[in-house]
From Swiss-Prot:
This is Bifunctional protein GlmU. Its EC number is 2.7.7.23, 2.3.1.157. Mg(2+) binds at D104, N228. The gene is glmU. The keyword Transferase applies. The keyword Membrane does not apply. It comes from Nitrosomonas europaea (strain ATCC 19718 / CIP 103999 / KCTC 2705 / NBRC 14298). InterPro entries: Bifunctional_GlmU (IPR005882), GlmU-like (IPR050065), GlmU_C_LbH (IPR038009), Hexapep (IPR001451), MobA-like_NTP_Trfase (IPR025877), Nucleotide-diphossugar_trans (IPR029044), Trimer_LpxA-like_sf (IPR011004). UDP-N-acetyl-alpha-D-glucosamine binds at residues 9-12, 23, 75, 80-81, 139, 155, 170, 228, 334, 352, 367, 378. Signal peptide: none annotated. It is an enzyme of class 2 (transferase). Pfam families: Hexapep, NTP_transf_3.
Amino acid sequence: MLQVDVVILAAGMGKRMCSSLPKVLHPLAGKPILSHVLDIARTLSPERICVVFGYGGELVRQVIGDHSDLIWVKQAQQLGTGHAVKQALPYLGNKGVTLVLFGDVPLVKSDTLKALIEKAREDNLVLLTVELDNPTGYGRIVRDPVTNRIQAIVEEKDASQSQKKIREINTGIMVLPNGRLGNWLDNLSDANTQGEYYLTDIIAMAVDAGIPIETSSPASDWEVSGVNDKIQLSILERAHQQDTANRLMEQGVMFADPARFDVRGRLVCGNDVEIDINCIFEGNVRLGNNVKIHANCILRNVIVSDGSVVHPFSLIEDAEVGKNCRIGPYARIRPGTQLDDAVHVGNFVEIKNSHIASESKVNHLSYVGDTEMGRRVNIGAGAITCNYDGAFKHRTVIEDDVFIGSDTQLVAPVTVARGSTIGAGSTITRDTPEGQLTLSRTKQTSIANWKRPRKDRN
């Protein structure tokens, strides 16, 4: 099997981004542009991955991380793509091939690169090319009209009128034989208007030496689109999101509008899932069968089981939701929360680091934190757990079949025993007995002949 090395060129500053952040660290679908390229490279199971970095290099390494499968190669001066690959040459194998990728071309697909590599041998060169309706500004692929073999790549400024009509362009992504790569790089020249060493000049060397040049093409043009400014970044963001939506719809997901939907991680859906507009899914999210996510919800690292419904404007993060639950609208489920089956969490309710057992309801205007709640519990409007004493968090235990009246404060640590009822407006500071009514209120008083204070209009 052919050994494959990968070199990712990520040294550019990205002046047109108008940002102090290196271009390859700008986020696309919730993670740095360069991370997308690395993820795709890893699907190829390469022998090694070399990342050529330059501008903002230490920050790039810090954000991406020094993973064991990465070799970081510094390009102190940005002297062109050929010069960049030459910096990685000492780390590459003597045999096999090298795939050259770009750190600012984040959406090329694994299947596209695998098809490219399948055409590679140790005695040829393979280019990823694409046909564009408007190829203006790109280097044209010039082929022999009889054999269809590549003769040259002609840059726009050097192209004749007939060559400018050619729609096939060079993407820059290529597979090079390691056995010839060193000699080719040594013979590159910077005698051009930019004073740089261009990797594409290798193609002319290969043609002159009679070395076969093969080509392959992606399924979609946007796969090979690069990011040079924030307009292009926004275009690729939408292309990526639309591609993700298309894949999910092919699996049966129903979108109210696939153009108003974002995945910033990984979303896995069961059958008959419905997703309304302006929903965002971050990290790892799994939706079971017949789940409905209404408009303007954010789910981050969440499992939502079969038949559950999340109503509009709800935020759920690092939590598990059981079957047939109802959440929201305007609910916030914070990290460490587990909702068992058939739990109802209503409007303006916040739950943090709590376990809510099946068939319990927290329907209105409540805060539940650091709580173990049993089955069939009803929490009245405005009830809260007071879990923080200013220094430490404490847990509240609410056992099965408890009814908590509205505007109740449960001051942790405290246990409300099975079957208890807590009267509205109570502040509970001690454990309650099982099956009894517990309340703490001042006696209601009415004062006769009392007059409300009034402002002196004079």
